[in-house]
Amino acid sequence: MSSDTQRWFGVVSLFPEMFQTFTEQGVTGRAVKSGKLKVDFFNPRDFTHDKHRTVDDRPYGGGPGMLMMVQPLLDAIRAAKQAAEKKTKVIYLSPQGKTLTQRGVKQLSENESVILVAGRYEGIDERVIEAEIDEEWSVGDYILSGGELPAMILMDAVARLVPGVLGHAQSAEQDSFSDGLLDCPHYTRPENLNGQSVPSVLLSGDHQKIKQWRDKQSLGRTWQRRPELLNDLALTEEQQRLLDEYQQELLQQNGSYSGMRGYDE
């Protein structure tokens, strides 16, 4: 896919107005204004045929809550597919989906067009999922009122990977999780803040030593705060050496690993 290809999102949502600021400000706003990202909305309420524009219905079997009405939702999804003009992946933002990771974001960023279905109420009819949904994605194990916020999270993460969207070409590469690790600490002026100074290596002007320090901090921070991430990585000899150095330096400072943030959780 060409780097200058416009990415398109079709969002199926009962509350498209929630996306207004999101598509006008920040990274996604710049992407939309520059033409690198296009977002169209398909409100199931616009596909109703009764005077009340009903979009919810009772679930079979009883129980609390309502489901999104099938007919308006199906029509909205199909309208989005037609607008895409080509076979497009349809994603349902669901707590039952696979957890969104940076690896998944990279995969999604390779698609020129994606349709996002933001559920409401207690969810959507299982038959709609089976017939119209290609993948289900979750942003975490917690409860939200709808799929709009997860849809924004997914779009923001994808937009950052679209060439030319970020101000610096290396910004996305240096983000946390871009290489499977957490990001290193960052510092700006003043050089001394409440008695705490910027690490001297960052003031040295030695780019090789600065990179080495950042790599070490990234590895060490991941080991301390998200050690499970290291299980999925095959560290190079240099990375393992840097991590060993980080651990030894902490031992010398603290006398043990106990009490370090995340270590004994």
Swiss-Prot record:
What Gene Ontology molecular-function terms does this entry list? Answer: tRNA (guanine(37)-N1)-methyltransferase activity
Q: Which UniProt keywords apply?
A: Cytoplasm, Methyltransferase, S-adenosyl-L-methionine, Transferase, tRNA processing
Function as written in the Swiss-Prot or TrEMBL entry: Specifically methylates guanosine-37 in various tRNAs.
Q: Which organism is it from?
A: Pseudoalteromonas atlantica (strain T6c / ATCC BAA-1087)
Q: Mind giving the lineage of the organism this protein is from?
A: Bacteria, Pseudomonadati, Pseudomonadota, Gammaproteobacteria, Alteromonadales
What's the protein called, per UniProt?
A: tRNA (guanine-N(1)-)-methyltransferase
> Which residues are listed as membrane-spanning?
none
> What's in the GO CC field?
cytosol
CDD domains according to UniProt: TrmD-like (cd18080)
Q: Which reaction does it catalyse?
A: guanosine(37) in tRNA + S-adenosyl-L-methionine = N(1)-methylguanosine(37) in tRNA + S-adenosyl-L-homocysteine + H(+)
